[in-house]
């Protein structure tokens, strides 16, 4: 049995008519891309293929735009917009709607969520943008037609350090690896990322990193901001103990890590 589109999907379909009614032709130069577009990466080869198709057959599905200043802002159809630019079109079919910032962002997000190649990081950042506009996780879940737990789990990815998010976006680690890193303490996540990348760990092996760390003595307090910053800089777990006087404890787990640390600190054996 076919399933009806849920959440915002019905709203996007309603705004893009199946017939020519309500569709106008606009100069492509009058349309500006949406700076809040949830999707940041587009496959170049796929864009070229779409541009070739547009040159041959034209742009068949209209863009969704809203008036802004002396022109228009793109709401939905970023991939088609970019391909139209590559194809050298002067005019494009479009549907013009007056939309608030929230409505525009919601529609841009749902269009991207309907694509299978949206990255986990882009999805999480899209949800985060909706939260920053005042929606709760429950409201976000209802609008995109997903369970609240799905939204919450996606948002947890944003707790990872930037290096891990970049590795996930580049395809160097999978979402499973990212979830395994979230099982580690914040100050251990960069070390975990390094282990995964350098040793080519599987998701199951990455999940075992927590058990490996569990054998170490338990820390009695949450890491300080300075400890986290030093951990990020050195790529190893660091603890700063004390106030005006104290000690800095750098934890390494192999001779290779120690040698790399010494080189980073400028020590020549």
Curated annotation (Swiss-Prot):
Region Required for DNA-binding: what ranges?
223-269
Q: Which UniProt keywords apply?
A: Chromosome partition, DNA-binding
Which GO cellular component terms are attached? chromosome
| Lineage of source species | Bacteria, Thermotogati, Deinococcota, Deinococci, Thermales
Which residue intervals are the DNA-binding region?
137-156
Which gene produces this protein?
spo0C
Concerning its family, UniProt says: Belongs to the ParB family.
**Region Stimulates ATPase activity of Soj by 8%: start-end pairs:** 1-20
What this chain does, per the entry, is described as:
Probably involved in chromosome partitioning. Binds to a plasmid centromere-like site parS. Stimulates the ATPase activity 10-fold of Soj; the first 20 residues may be responsible.
Q: Which CDD domains match?
A: SPO0J_N
Task: Read off the NCBIfam families from this record.
Answer: parB_part
**Subunit info?**
Homodimer, probably via the C-terminal 46 residues. Dimerization of the N-terminal H-T-H region may require DNA-binding. Probably interacts with ATPase Soj.
- Tell me the InterPro entries matching this sequence: Chromosome_partition/occlusion, HTH_ParB/Spo0J, ParB/RepB/Spo0J, ParB/Sulfiredoxin_dom, ParB/Sulfiredoxin_sf, ParB_dimer_C
Q: Per its record, how is this protein called by name?
A: Chromosome-partitioning protein Spo0J
Q: Name one GO biological process term.
A: chromosome segregation
GO MF annotation list: DNA binding
């Amino acid at each position: 049995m076919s399933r009806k589109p849920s959440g915002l999907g019905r709203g996007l379909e309603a705004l893009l008519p199946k017939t020519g009614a309500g569709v106008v032709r606009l100069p492509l130069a009058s349309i500006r891309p949406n700076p809040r577009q949830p999707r940041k990466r587009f496959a170049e080869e796929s864009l070229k293929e779409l541009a070739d198709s547009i040159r041959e057959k034209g742009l068949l599905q209209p863009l969704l735009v809203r008036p802004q200043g002396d022109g228009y802002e793109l709401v939905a159809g970023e991939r088609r917009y970019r391909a139209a630019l590559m194809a050298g079109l002067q005019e494009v079919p479009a549907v013009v709607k007056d939309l608030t910032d929230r409505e525009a962002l919601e529609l841009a997000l749902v269009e991207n969520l309907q694509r299978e190649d949206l990255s986990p990081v882009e999805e999480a950042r899209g949800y985060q943008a909706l939260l920053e506009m005042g929606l709760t996780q429950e409201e976000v879940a209802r609008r995109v037609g997903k369970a609240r737990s799905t939204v919450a789990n996606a948002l947890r990815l944003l707790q990872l350090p930037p290096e891990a998010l970049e590795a996930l976006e580049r395809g160097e680690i999978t979402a499973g690896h990212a979830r395994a890193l979230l099982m580690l303490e914040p100050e251990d996540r960069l070390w975990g990322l390094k282990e995964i990348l350098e040793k080519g760990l599987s998701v199951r092996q990455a999940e075992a990193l927590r058990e490996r760390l569990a054998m170490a003595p338990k820390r009695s307090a949450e890491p300080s901001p300075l400890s986290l910053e030093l951990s990020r800089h050195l790529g190893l777990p660091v603890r700063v103990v004390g106030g005006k006087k104290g000690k800095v404890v750098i934890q390494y787990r192999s001779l290779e890590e120690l040698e790399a640390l010494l080189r980073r600190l400028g020590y020549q054996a």
